[in-house]
Amino acid sequence: MEHTYQYAWVIPLLPLPVILSMGFGLFLIPIATKNFRRIWAFPSVLLLSIAMVFSVQLSIQQINGSSIYQYLWSWTINNDFSLEFGYLIDPLTSIMLMLITTVGILVLIYSDGYMSHDEGYLRFFIYISFFNISMLGLVTSSNLIQIYFFWELVGMCSYLLIGFWFTRPIAASACQKAFVTNRIGDFGLLLGILGFFWITGSLEFRDLFQTANNWIPNNGTTSLLTTLCAFLLFLGAVAKSAQFPLHVWLPDAMEGPTPISALIHAATMVAAGIFLLARLLPLFISLPLIMTFISLVGTITLFLGATLALAQRDIKRTLAYSTMSQLGYMMLALGIGSYQAALFHLITHAYSKALLFLGSGSIIHSMEPLVGYSPDKSQNMALMGGLRKYIPITRTAFLWGTLSICGIPPLACFWSKDEILSNSWLYSPFFGIIASFTAGLTAFYMFRIYLLTFDGYFRFHFQNYSSTKEGSLYSISLWGNRIPKGVSKDFVLSTTKSEVYFFSQNISISKGQGNTRNRIESFSTSFGSKNVFTYPHETGNTMLFPLLILLLFTFFIGFIGIPFDNETMDNGIAGVTILSKWLIPSINFTQESSNSSINSYEFITNAISSVSLVILGLFIAYIFYGSAYSFFQNLDLQNSFYKGSPKKNFFYQVKKKIYSWSYNRGYIDIFYSRLFTLGIRGLTELTEFFDKGVIDGITNGVGLASFCIGEEIKYVGGGRISSYLFFFLCYVSVFLFFFLS
């Protein structure tokens, strides 16, 4: 066992030889390296698999009751200061190692098929392998300096992958947006690290936690500087994990390739912020004000993310807002001290969300040959529908992933989300109400994605394309009926003859339909050329295999949080779980063990209430977006409901406001653009005017005045010495007159 821990430092370095080999190959033999580029996927997967084997062994040892191991190498700068580097193996590290390696392997396999025809195939594998190295180094770091170093590497890799297709202006802009937004959090993290070093004189977790224990007897009463430094550390996690108000970069990050979206949302970029808070939770627990602030930010984020996902038309952006909301649940759990529930949800959400993102990539991959390679079309749910007939394997995997995120038992996310909801109700009814209501919203917008993508008819055949702006924008009504008048007409989905609102399932097909599955029709692309298309088809085995493996994780990973100690269950208290055995040292450290047990009756009651909210959300989504909408439309119920003046109808106005709020991202991006972008631009223009008009004006004015005076004076003397003597005596006389008087 000791032997395994001694060589644990190898885990982050295992993927490095492949990166170096690809780099040297591109430098020395570029043509051969590019011609045989797909062979590099095998060593990438192989070495990360070896890292996974090491991680599994470490995790098993942690579950069996091993203690925390830390190895340090000291780098002495002078007699008074030494900088230590090393690695830390504890339950949190082992969980993150398992998560990163398993999801990373599946994403690498998936990427081999998804990126096979991309010119940047090798560059993508270099970036993604280095991404895995950075995250593995982050979770094994033994002090704050190492965390910050790998924190920056994780950010750098994410920026490179978000802007992978940098020739597209939108992707380049998304990369810049992610960079600038995360700079705010990273700067706060750096200041917080330096502040705690100034307070405690150490950057080691052990020393920080020992100092924090001294604050607890004082009822958390600490200096303002300590609270400020803790807030700055939290600011880093806010930006990295896309929490309000620094969440704006996450939806735009979907401009990167879909495999990296899965990795960012499951196991790397956004998980880094949650990991940082979990690692430093013993420090934050001693600061009640910061803990309350963390829970408040998490609550705002989980609700905001759910509301912003309600009316999005881009499938990946909707999933991005879903990730933002689920990260809010984890942040809320950490803020109320529910350490185990937060990590449990981090695990279950990672596999379910990776399944959904890779499933969306399979959908996009099947749509691109038909609609083109523009994300506005291939990712637009307005052009999908009825895909269950054409990509059944993807549809099955996506459905189970959707139900898991919604919280349907016995899928993975049900167990973790239900634990967070129970703990939030125990901590504060305010947090419990918002978290429970958001669970219903989650079911609504997630099932909306599924219905718009797989239910009904394949709507692309009814869409008229043109090169005009009106023909290139599509949208989705929030409630399934006609777009409100307040929304721009550019967002209406229509055909050449009449408007077709695609959420209705009784769309009339053009005459001569026949066997439309085998029909080949022409359509006009945005380039104005005529082409032919068929229906979407299932992707290759290299893309389907990761979906099936993630589907198994979605089914069974939740059981690590289910009690298996029958004797304890007989006493009416929740028994020991695999996760609780895994986290025993950490739970003891955060003093959560007494709060994590819950009566069996309470568990069943809470589960029934949460599942009822989820079923209600699913039912409402089915009413507005499923086959049931056609039934209600045929009954003319909606027309009778709006028979009065619809503009004066309260429901109509609320619906329009919600749609506008959600579709426009809560107007937060617009607010930031006007406040910061336009404000800073105006400030720079004012500064430029002051610099050129005032500062340069004074300097240039003095020079110009001297020049003009000199030009006038030079004609006075005329070159005669008598004139010079005359003026000299006159000036001396005047000077003496004023001086003597």
Curated annotation (Swiss-Prot):
<feature type="transmembrane region" description="Helical">
    <location>
        <begin position="147"/>
        <end position="167"/>
    </location>
</feature>
<feature type="transmembrane region" description="Helical">
    <location>
        <begin position="354"/>
        <end position="374"/>
    </location>
</feature>
<feature type="transmembrane region" description="Helical">
    <location>
        <begin position="544"/>
        <end position="564"/>
    </location>
</feature>
<feature type="transmembrane region" description="Helical">
    <location>
        <begin position="425"/>
        <end position="445"/>
    </location>
</feature>
<keyword id="KW-0618">Plastoquinone</keyword>
<feature type="transmembrane region" description="Helical">
    <location>
        <begin position="612"/>
        <end position="632"/>
    </location>
</feature>
<feature type="transmembrane region" description="Helical">
    <location>
        <begin position="184"/>
        <end position="204"/>
    </location>
</feature>
<feature type="transmembrane region" description="Helical">
    <location>
        <begin position="258"/>
        <end position="278"/>
    </location>
</feature>
<dbReference type="GO" id="GO:0015990">
    <property type="term" value="P:electron transport coupled proton transport"/>
</dbReference>
<dbReference type="GO" id="GO:0009535">
    <property type="term" value="C:chloroplast thylakoid membrane"/>
</dbReference>
<dbReference type="GO" id="GO:0042773">
    <property type="term" value="P:ATP synthesis coupled electron transport"/>
</dbReference>
<keyword id="KW-0521">NADP</keyword>
<comment type="function">
    <text>NDH shuttles electrons from NAD(P)H:plastoquinone, via FMN and iron-sulfur (Fe-S) centers, to quinones in the photosynthetic chain and possibly in a chloroplast respiratory chain. The immediate electron acceptor for the enzyme in this species is believed to be plastoquinone. Couples the redox reaction to proton translocation, and thus conserves the redox energy in a proton gradient.</text>
</comment>
<feature type="transmembrane region" description="Helical">
    <location>
        <begin position="216"/>
        <end position="238"/>
    </location>
</feature>
<dbReference type="InterPro" id="IPR001516">
    <property type="entry name" value="Proton_antipo_N"/>
</dbReference>
<keyword id="KW-1278">Translocase</keyword>
<feature type="transmembrane region" description="Helical">
    <location>
        <begin position="327"/>
        <end position="347"/>
    </location>
</feature>
<feature type="transmembrane region" description="Helical">
    <location>
        <begin position="9"/>
        <end position="29"/>
    </location>
</feature>
<protein>
    <recommendedName>
        <fullName>NAD(P)H-quinone oxidoreductase subunit 5, chloroplastic</fullName>
        <ecNumber>7.1.1.-</ecNumber>
    </recommendedName>
</protein>
<dbReference type="Pfam" id="PF00361">
    <property type="entry name" value="Proton_antipo_M"/>
</dbReference>
<dbReference type="InterPro" id="IPR001750">
    <property type="entry name" value="ND/Mrp_TM"/>
</dbReference>
<dbReference type="InterPro" id="IPR002128">
    <property type="entry name" value="NADH_UbQ_OxRdtase_chlpt_su5_C"/>
</dbReference>
<feature type="transmembrane region" description="Helical">
    <location>
        <begin position="396"/>
        <end position="416"/>
    </location>
</feature>
<feature type="transmembrane region" description="Helical">
    <location>
        <begin position="721"/>
        <end position="741"/>
    </location>
</feature>
<keyword id="KW-0874">Quinone</keyword>
<dbReference type="GO" id="GO:0048038">
    <property type="term" value="F:quinone binding"/>
</dbReference>
<comment type="subunit">
    <text>NDH is composed of at least 16 different subunits, 5 of which are encoded in the nucleus.</text>
</comment>
<dbReference type="InterPro" id="IPR018393">
    <property type="entry name" value="NADHpl_OxRdtase_5_subgr"/>
</dbReference>
<dbReference type="Pfam" id="PF00662">
    <property type="entry name" value="Proton_antipo_N"/>
</dbReference>
<dbReference type="InterPro" id="IPR003945">
    <property type="entry name" value="NU5C-like"/>
</dbReference>
<keyword id="KW-0472">Membrane</keyword>
<keyword id="KW-0812">Transmembrane</keyword>
<keyword id="KW-1133">Transmembrane helix</keyword>
<dbReference type="GO" id="GO:0008137">
    <property type="term" value="F:NADH dehydrogenase (ubiquinone) activity"/>
</dbReference>
<feature type="transmembrane region" description="Helical">
    <location>
        <begin position="89"/>
        <end position="109"/>
    </location>
</feature>
<keyword id="KW-0813">Transport</keyword>
<comment type="similarity">
    <text>Belongs to the complex I subunit 5 family.</text>
</comment>
<feature type="transmembrane region" description="Helical">
    <location>
        <begin position="125"/>
        <end position="145"/>
    </location>
</feature>
<keyword id="KW-0150">Chloroplast</keyword>
<keyword id="KW-0934">Plastid</keyword>
<feature type="transmembrane region" description="Helical">
    <location>
        <begin position="280"/>
        <end position="300"/>
    </location>
</feature>
<keyword id="KW-0793">Thylakoid</keyword>
